């Protein structure tokens, strides 16, 4: 059970340290569930409570997700070690990124459903 009854996680990302990250669409939060002890920690998404985070992935030691209601749609990187965020306008507008996955090389691929695109984020 998540600590806030209003949480509505859309997608999950498994990290390499036995934790699960979730994009809380309804509240505009990024959350982490530690599978070893059940503890949950949450961070407000950079664009605020109406940002509607959706697609999410773990790649090269960081969490990547999309704020679907930010205008323009925003690509977010979260560093779990420093607990800090970086943001960029989503290339091509992005709109709602419903799913993200990671290539064998550790880059992020996105499904941008409302703009008929598949995106590629090269992580350097």
Identify the role of each PLM range.
Residues 5, 26, 36, 49, ...:
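A generic "binding-loop/recognition-motif" signal
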Residues 20-26, 63-70, 110-114:
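Conserved beta-strand positions in repeat-built beta-propeller and related beta-rich domains
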Residues 1-2, 39-45, 84-90:
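A short beta-strand motif characteristic of beta-propeller blades
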């Amino acid at each position: 059970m998540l600590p806030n009854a209003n949480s509505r996680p859309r997608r999950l990302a498994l990290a390499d340290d036995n934790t699960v990250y979730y994009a809380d669409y309804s509240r505009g939060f990024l959350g982490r569930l530690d599978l070893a002890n059940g503890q949950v920690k949450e961070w407000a998404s950079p664009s605020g409570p109406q940002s509607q985070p959706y697609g999410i992935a773990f790649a090269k030691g960081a969490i990547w997700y999309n704020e679907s209601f930010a205008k323009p749609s925003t690509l977010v990187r979260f560093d779990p070690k420093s607990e800090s965020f970086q943001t960029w306008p989503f290339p091509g507008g992005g709109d709602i990124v419903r799913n993200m996955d990671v290539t064998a090389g550790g880059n992020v691929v996105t499904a941008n459903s409302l703009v008929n695109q598949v995106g590629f984020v090269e992580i350097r």
